[in-house]
Structure formats: C-alpha cells, structure tokens
C-alpha cells in the first residue's frame, strides 16, 4: 500500500509540471525550447521562456540528486517485494509438501523401512531449509520496513522542500515586484534628470543672453562715457560762447540806450546834425556775424518736391562701401533725406542721402543687425539683431534708448506701430509687441514657424501680416493673439519679405525663395498678380523687395548681382539692372526713397549704390 502511495506521489510530481526523471536528469514537460519553435517566437516571448527555463533549472538542480536516490530506493523496494513474494510462495509450497508427508495414505504402512528412513531424512533437511528461508524472510521484511521508513522520511522531506520552494517562489515574486518598482522609480528619476537638464540648458541660454546684454550695455556705457566727455567739453565751450555773446549784446544794448538818450536830448536843438549823428551811430551798431568756422550752424537739407511719377533707375550715380562686413538691411526715413543700413559689423549706420556722407554710427549690438526701420516721426531707429534682442536709438543723438530682450532666438524683423509701440518677429517662432514707454513686452504671439518679416495692416496696429519659413503668410489680430487667416500654399519657398502697398491699403507684396513675388488682396486673401523673370533668382533668406512710392513699379535684387524691376499693373518685366553690383554678390535689399526721386541698392559685398 505504501508503495502504491509513493508511486502515485511520483506521478503527481512528474505530471504537475515540476519535472520528470530520466537518466538522472530533470526536464520540464511544459516548455518546448527546440531551435525551430524558439526562433519563431517574438523577442518578448523568448525572454519569458528564457526566464521560465532559468527558474526551472534553478529549482530542479537542488532536487535532482535527491530524486535519483529516491528512484533507486523505489527500484530496490520493487526488487525486495518481488523476492519476498517468491519466498512466500516457496514457503507455502514447502509447508504443503511437509503436511502431505506427515499424513501418508493408508497403503503407506506397507512400504519398506528403507523408504521410510529416506523420507524422514529428506523432511528433516527441508525443515532446516524452511527455517533458513524464514530467517531470510524476516530479514527481508525488516529491510522492507526500513525502506518504507526511509521512503516516508523522503516524502516528508519532499513536502518540506516543496513548502520551502513555494516560499522561495513567493519571495522571488516579491523581489521581482520590488525590482520592477525600483526600475519604475529609476525611470522616473531619469525623466526628472532629463527635465532638469533641459531647465539647466534653458537657464544657461537665458544667462548667456543676459551676459551678452551686459556686454553690449558695457560697450554702450563706455561709448556713452566718451560721448559724455565730448558733450561736456562742447557744453562748456557753448556756455562760454553764450556768456560772451550775452555780454556783447548787453554792451550793444547799453550803447543803443545811451545813443537813444543823446538823440532825444539833441532832437530839438539841431535836427540836421542829429540826423547825421544818427546815421553814423547806426552804422557803428551793425553787428558783424562771426565766421562760419567759428560758430557751427546746423545744415538744413532741401527736401525737394514730391514727384508724381517714380524714377526708373538706369545707371549708377554713386557707389560707396557701407560696412566692414556684408549688408543685411536698409530703410529710408519719412522724407527720404536719411538712409539707415545694418550689417554684419554689429552696427547701424545713418547716411545723408544727398551728400552720401555718413552722419552717425549706432552701436550696442553684439551680433549682426538684420532689420532697421524709422519711427513715424523719424526721431528713433529700431534695429533687430541676431543676439536675440532689438534696440532703439535716438536718430539725432545716436544714443540707445531701449534694449528689448525676451526672444530666445534671432530677431529677424521689427516695425513701428506708432512712436510708442513696436512689434518684432523672431526665429523662436514668436511675435512680440512692446510698449516703449514702459520698456517691456505687452503680448507674445506664438506663430508656429520662424518669422522672417512682418508688416502693420492699417493705422491702429491691431492687425498684422507675417511671412514665415514654412512658406506661409499669416494674418493676426494682435489683441486676441490669434491668426485670422493662414495662407499656407501661397508660395513654394520660405517668405523673405512682406511690403505694404504705398497706394492701396488692401494690398501687400510678398517675396519668396521660390523666385516669385506676389500681390495679395488682404480682403479676399487672393493672389492678384505674380511677378517672375528668368534672370531673377532670390538668393537670400532676407532679400527685401520694394514698391515704388507711386505704386507703379516693383523691384527686387537677385543672386547674381542684378536688380529686376516689374510693372506693378501688368506683371511684366520693365528693366533688369546688371553689371553694377559684383557678379555673384547677392543684392539683399533695394528701395525707392519716399520722394520717389532716389533709388538705392545694397549687396553682400558691403557696397551701396545710388541710381539715377
């Protein structure tokens, strides 16, 4: 009975998925690890199977020797049982034979004495054999009992080991859960580290912006210090001259009073003599003006008369080097007598258009100036820079009034809404509106693409149009900060400039890297006219097109140094100006003055050309 229990226990152990015993090795009957099936399973299933096989290997190695011993004991038990049964059968047969011999039949008394004696001898020999067999049987029963005891001990050990294995499995599962939790915590910590690294990078960028601004302010401060010294010296000289002139005027006034008193006294006595003395005294009172070299007299430029028809340029009149590096932008003031240019030498230069002489240099930027514009009253100049800031200078004095910081990318464009408000567009995909009286940003508009240029629509400044790197023109309500219209397919290349029509407030002109210019009606958002020419190639991301003040012509510079001029009314090419700018030097900007009688262009090779 105990043997059958052990056999059923072995069947339970072998059939329950723990393992089978075969040639002293332990194998899992559940998981197949053949090469063909293993390679056909996806990677995550392979990992699970590999982990289960590792677990089975770890769990079976501890019991393989024990199971082998247990199997040997079972075999010995079966052998002993077979031998015991055999001996028991022999004993039974011997006992039966002995009983038969002890009770002979009735005819047996007639046997002879010799056969009786031989039978008794054989019975006595068999009795000794039976005793030996009984002793062996007793021994075998003892061995069998001991084997049962050992099997019972082994079974209890197996149960204990199973319990221990379950505990270890539970502990392993808890450890795996803990490991998974720790992994999740580590991943969260890594994500936090990445976020903190991004914050650190952002803070470093802000710090770099502040350092650049500090450097520019220090440069501006040193420049202003030298200007202050010069102005103080000039002021002292002017005060001295003013006092001297006041003293001279006072002395002349005293002489005039004395003369008047004398004339009153002599009026009645000798009228003729008094008239002669009066004429002599008046001639003595004539004040000789000081020489022009002694007293600086401000030069007032002749503004000229507005021409109803814009000049069509044909040849170069003047040519000069504008900057120490390539030129990026230029702008006229409202009456056309001043021209501001910005370049890669980090400064804005103001030029007298009539004489072609430089009037002032505006400093403070730490990188290239990429956009300039005059305020409506011409008192200020706005310049935007690649140092992520925009600056405002006083036109007459050349002093910096404001430094507008807040963008985190290059500021590509800036325009005046009025004398106290400006708007800037940046590579950081934002448009910012600024209050110049308070000196800070009043609104930030997120435009989802780098802004290359923008214009103000209408006089109120509430509506804007901007051109972007993603080939789109966007129209904005600055009060809401939301786009009112997006023209995403207006061009096939990025927009390089947007210009208001000087004669029609409902039209704007766009220029693009797809080598075309287009007039857009801002009421219907339709393209009215497209301008292109085989010789026109827009070669720069900041190429600015120009509209003549009378609205008749449109001009833009090409990558080969030529300038194309179109008729705005029919889109036909009127003229192509060549062989003036260096061949291969892109013309970055060209413009008519507001008086329509001057046309100026600039290129990457630092040249400024005035046409006639």
Curated annotation (Swiss-Prot):
PANTHER family: AUTOPHAGY PROTEIN 16-LIKE, AUTOPHAGY-RELATED 16, ISOFORM F. Keywords: Repeat, WD repeat. One of its GO terms (molecular function) is protein-membrane adaptor activity. Belongs to the WD repeat tipD family. The keyword Repeat applies. SMART domains: WD40. This is Protein tipD. SUPFAM superfamilies: WD40 repeat-like. Residues 106-128 have a biased composition (Low complexity). CDD domains: Atg16_CCD, WD40. Transmembrane segments: none annotated. GO terms for cellular component: Atg12-Atg5-Atg16 complex; autophagosome membrane; extracellular matrix; phagophore assembly site membrane. WD repeats lie at residues 322-361, 364-403, 406-444, 447-486, 490-530, 535-576, 582-611. Pfam families: ATG16 (PF08614), WD40 (PF00400). GO terms for biological process: autophagosome assembly; autophagosome maturation; culmination involved in sorocarp development; macroautophagy; phagocytosis; pinocytosis; proteasome-mediated ubiquitin-dependent protein catabolic process; sorocarp development. Residues 95-128 are annotated as: Disordered. Not known; disruption of the gene for tipD results in morphological defects. It comes from Dictyostelium discoideum (Social amoeba). InterPro entries: ATG16, Autophagy-rel_prot_16_dom, G-protein_beta_WD-40_rep, WD40/YVTN_repeat-like_dom_sf, WD40_repeat_CS, WD40_repeat_dom_sf, WD40_rpt.
